[in-house]
């Protein structure tokens, strides 16, 4: 079937009978990822302004080619690769359909990345300024090749949210070499587990993978990592790793930077002994505020998910950088009180003198520099008014 995304027209597989996503019997196309791709296009446009020398883009798991075609339409010199020859043929057809130049290659992404430079099947000058990893499941099997061979930017999607968030803990430990915990802030847990693993992977190549934009949306995690090949910068970024100590009784949490955990024997708030440790996690900023603002400026009217993309980026830009968020509904359930509107809840925290913002992780999530006890005393129980 033919579709339009952004400014390009594409041929994609028709949906199977009864499917709510455009998934054919062979080549994969997911229309629910249009939001992801809209933000990707805006990020690529913003990055062109940030680093004009970044010209080449690898769509490492191209499938129908939609991501690569949209990147080509934004001015990048695109290479689309996939292990499925039918996918590569469809990607080539979609490039031609839009009168766009680009190369297609039936190959494994790791092989293409490791053969960049003199050994590249694309030519001795081939090197990728931007590498986009959008696999089904975890991106970790492709991370080494990407960080060892990309020049400027690595864009990563992870859809294995259950291991990332701690719901499938052993799988998360095996894949990400981190202990994840399934808490009420599980979307952010997943993002910080992923960033921890990616930053540690890049550091093995004396490279800092700096998050300049990240978001968690619709059962996937997405991050954009700018590369700095100074070993000292990689060391600085590793110092943003650490641990979160979470009380399962009162929901208090505290964090500690460093490579060695020092978990408390009991909760300093309720004195309970059900304190669990998560980590090593990335505890630093998930985005660069100025870059996020520029990405938002490149969300344009032809994008199908313009309203949601702008809303997500606005929240990501403005949310506090504290490492974990709270959920008002979960707190109110714990306190046996009714929830109130989020704007009113945030305003009550501001009135009490605390910093507080809503976050993009959910409609009832917020970040604040107040403790659990301070949040409870600063906000009202509507049943007692």
Curated annotation (Swiss-Prot):
Keywords: Metal-binding, Methyltransferase, RNA-binding, S-adenosyl-L-methionine, Transferase, tRNA processing, tRNA-binding, Zinc. It catalyses: guanosine(26) in tRNA + 2 S-adenosyl-L-methionine = N(2)-dimethylguanosine(26) in tRNA + 2 S-adenosyl-L-homocysteine + 2 H(+). The keyword Transferase applies. InterPro entries: SAM-dependent_MTases_sf, Trm1, TRM1_arc_bac, tRNA_met_Trm1_C. S-adenosyl-L-methionine binds at residues 37, 67, 82, 108-109. Pfam families: TRM. One of its GO terms (biological process) is tRNA N2-guanine methylation. GO terms for molecular function: tRNA (guanine(26)-N2)-dimethyltransferase activity; tRNA binding. Its EC number is 2.1.1.216. Transmembrane segments: none annotated. Zn(2+) binds at residues 247, 250, 267, 270. Residues 1-379 form the Trm1 methyltransferase domain. NCBIfam families: PRK04338.1-1 (NF003327), TRM1 (TIGR00308). HAMAP family: tRNA_dimethyltr_TRM1. Dimethylates a single guanine residue at position 26 of a number of tRNAs using S-adenosyl-L-methionine as donor of the methyl groups. Belongs to the class I-like SAM-binding methyltransferase superfamily. Trm1 family. This is tRNA (guanine(26)-N(2))-dimethyltransferase. It comes from Haloquadratum walsbyi (strain DSM 16790 / HBSQ001).
